[in-house]
Amino acid sequence: MIEVLLVTICLAVFPYQGSSIILESGNVNDYEVVYPRKVSALPKGAVQPKYEDAMQYEFKVNGEAVVLHLEKNKGLFSEDYSETHYSPDGREITTYPSVEDHCYYHGRIHNDADSTASISACDGLKGYFKLQGETYPIEPLELSDSEAHAVFKYENVEKEDEAPKMCGVTQNWESDESIKKASQLYLTPEQQRFPQRYIKLAIVVDHGMYTKYSSNFKKIRKRVHQMVSNINEMCRPLNIAITLALLDVWSEKDFITVQADAPTTAGLFGDWRERVLLKKKNHDHAQLLTDTNFARNTIGWAYVGRMCDEKYSVAVVKDHSSKVFMVAVTMTHELGHNLGMEHDDKDKCKCDTCIMSAVISDKQSKLFSDCSKDYYQTFLTNDNPQCILNAPLRTDTVSTPVSGNEFLEAGEECDCGSPENPCCDAATCKLRPGAQCAEGLCCDQCRFKKKRTICRRARGDNPDDRCTGQSADCPRNGLYG
């Protein structure tokens, strides 16, 4: 029996509430500052895992104490998850990073049945939690004190622009009848829970978005992982497990002509997916993230009810906000179309800000309306898409692994990975001239850190871990030689 580790974190509210600050999510006008303090239940001297399977946070919001329970989202990545980028001469470089010990969690607030949470613990705490109907983002503050975090409400983030943002799918008003019919169906509690379904997701990042983030592969990877974690959390009430199967970044050029007309781009992307992407690895649904400004304030487009179709199980989404959550809502919205959902009708669905609203809101909900659930249930009943019946397997891969599994193999001096890595040549897996290392807690700018440099702060009664000066690895329990 595997024991679940329970970790308690106390978040002490800083003595003041900030009035305005620029965060990764944008300019926030009102926020609270909190300090995570970790208290581990591990026995004295035990090795601390990098990311625990389960955690518990205690903190205050608006003066009220809450308890946040988190569990690692163990199904977030497929077993053969891969990342692809391209060399300047056009060669495809595919890596298979180890993602088992990842840092993405989902959870809930104690004694709040409607609460949810989606948190990244990669570098501090970043994500959101829903408490008493309100959604609160949390993210680290870039201060000298690295433990400081901000908690705020989405409506306190200044708008990035005043133009309305909307889905480009044209409402099929004749489909209102299907809502009525679906709504008239009596669903037992068992049916309302929805059968378990699994969607293997492929994310493609176009060249415009790649350059938008300074051609920084790691930054894009982190952003996409956070998006998929959020999508997974939003789909949980439908009993859908989202698994990221592959990330393909067009680092040198676009492989289709990304046009201002979103449906045209979706058609081109669907053709490319059928011809190229599906031959690399099997997956159920693919989305293209782009920095292209679509016409008519469109931020996303997808085919309705075409999940599992080799050409039409696709969507195109503009990376329209600095807020990861807002883009993730759009991606979930377009996924909803592929699962048979139409836009919410204001008169019938009683939810102006739910996921399938045609226009995105500053107070965007992370919930599917009853109408969306009826559409989805009808789609499952009538179409019964086969590709989402089974959990992802290793046999879903149809290509040969290349490199980049975060382990050094025979002939490798460093693990092939991001093309912008200044220390490791991604094409040869060799250290670049003058480099001692490519990654590790004791590696800084391709050189070993000095002996006795702290690389991991003490926890409990354990001493600080310090670098040896001879390796990029950070030894445990203060053994630095």
Curated annotation (Swiss-Prot):
State which residues form the propeptide.
21-189, 393-410
Q: What is its EC number?
A: 3.4.24.-
Q: Which residues are recorded as binding Zn(2+)?
A: H333, H337, H343
For this chain the motif Cell attachment site maps to: 459-461
UniProt modified residues of type Pyrrolidone carboxylic acid (Glu): E190
Q: How is it modified after translation?
A: The N-terminus is blocked.
- Where does it primarily localize? secreted
**Expression by tissue:** Expressed by the venom gland.
PROSITE patterns per UniProt: ADAM_MEPRO, DISINTEGRIN_1, DISINTEGRIN_2, ZINC_PROTEASE
The residues the record assigns to binding an L-amino acid tripeptide are: R296, N297, T298, I299, S357
- Co-factor(s): Zn(2+)
- Catalytic positions are E334
Q: Is the keyword Transmembrane assigned to this protein?
A: no
Q: What is this protein called?
A: Zinc metalloproteinase/disintegrin
